Amino acid sequence: MRPQQAPVSGKVFIQRDYSSGTRCQFQTKFPAELENRVDRQQFEETVRTLNNLYAEAEKLGGQSYLEGCLACLTAYTIFLCMETHYEKVLKKVSKYIQEQNEKIYAPQGLLLTDPIERGLRVIEITIYEDRGVSSGR
């Protein structure tokens, strides 16, 4: 059964981690609500990978500098014909989340929501009811 067909049992929100400043990174603390649903190491690896991808997106380098210069020279019309480094990495993040949902989370009755859909404030994990276990409600 696909999780989208089961009723929603709850949601877990993984908050941003501001301990290293305002760069986009999320807490790797394992939420108790996911106990017996997903392996702690897999969860932490998923969040660490997301944190690394967001760090890559925000990294300043030659490409970012060149994009900025081209943007100024073309009154930002260059972005009509090319993607920025940041946009490319955000696509990588979306693809990674989709893969993780298919391989790890969906079979466990969970669904990761792309943080960009929540304004990069939280990672939302939807928990679907397990039809095999009676909920007592």
UniProtKB/Swiss-Prot annotation:
The keyword Cell membrane does not apply. A lipid is attached at C69, C72 (S-palmitoyl cysteine). The keyword Membrane applies. It is found in: Golgi apparatus membrane. Keywords: Golgi apparatus, Lipoprotein, Membrane, Palmitate. It is a lipid-anchor. One of its GO terms (cellular component) is palmitoyltransferase complex. GO terms for biological process: Golgi to plasma membrane protein transport; Golgi to plasma membrane transport; peptidyl-L-cysteine S-palmitoylation; protein stabilization; protein targeting to membrane. Pfam families: Erf4. Palmitoylated on Cys-69 and Cys-72; which is required for Golgi localization and interaction with GOLGA3. Belongs to the ERF4 family. May be involved in protein transport from Golgi to cell surface. The ZDHHC9-GOLGA7 complex is a palmitoyltransferase specific for HRAS and NRAS. Interacts with GOLGA3. Interacts with ZDHHC9. This is Golgin subfamily A member 7. It comes from Rattus norvegicus (Rat). The lineage of its organism: Eukaryota, Metazoa, Chordata, Craniata, Vertebrata.
